């Protein structure tokens, strides 16, 4: 039985105006993460978590759906402006940015942060199919 004197505090939602959308577009999946400027994650979504499996995960439409889901979840924080950081060579790069724009966010700048080696590790051998 609960004690009569205990009270639970109502959780206060913080309001964030500016945020950063990190889009990681690999050949197999697209991960969209929306955070504040300090890097605290507000929401995230993936193509696989949006109901797409197998080769449909790596389509531009799956990336669009994932970006819409992440954008709608981040709207609870009062987000208005987004910087977009795109990483990776996948097919969902452009469509994820367009979907975030369609969600009503003002996109202030788009940056490509794909890691490029300065002749680092040896790449894997070519596939023979």
Swiss-Prot record:
User: Which regions form coiled coils?
Assistant: none
Coiled coil: present as a keyword of the record?
no
The reply on keyword Ribonucleoprotein is yes
Its GO biological process annotations read: translation
InterPro entries recorded for this chain? Ribosomal_uS11, Ribosomal_uS11_bac-type, Ribosomal_uS11_CS, Ribosomal_uS11_sf
Give the superkingdom in one word: Bacteria
Q: How does it assemble?
A: Part of the 30S ribosomal subunit. Interacts with proteins S7 and S18. Binds to IF-3.
Cross-referenced NCBIfam families, in alphabetical order? Answer: PRK05309.1 (NF003698), uS11_bact (TIGR03632)
Q: What is this protein called?
A: Small ribosomal subunit protein uS11
Organism expressing this protein natively: Marinobacter nauticus (strain ATCC 700491 / DSM 11845 / VT8) (Marinobacter aquaeolei)
* Gene name linked to the record: rpsK
């Amino acid at each position: 039985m609960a004690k009569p004197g205990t009270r639970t505090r109502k959780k206060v939602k913080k309001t964030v105006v500016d945020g950063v959308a990190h889009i990681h577009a690999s050949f197999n999946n697209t991960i969209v993460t929306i955070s504040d400027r300090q890097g605290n994650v507000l929401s995230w979504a993936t193509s696989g978590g949006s109901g797409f499996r197998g080769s449909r995960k790596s389509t531009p439409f799956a990336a669009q759906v994932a970006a819409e889901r992440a954008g709608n979840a981040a709207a609870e924080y009062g987000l208005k402006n987004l910087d977009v950081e795109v990483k990776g060579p996948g097919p969902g790069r452009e469509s994820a940015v367009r979907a975030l724009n369609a969600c009503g966010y003002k996109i202030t700048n788009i940056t490509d942060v794909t890691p490029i080696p300065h002749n680092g590790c040896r790449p894997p051998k070519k596939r023979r199919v």
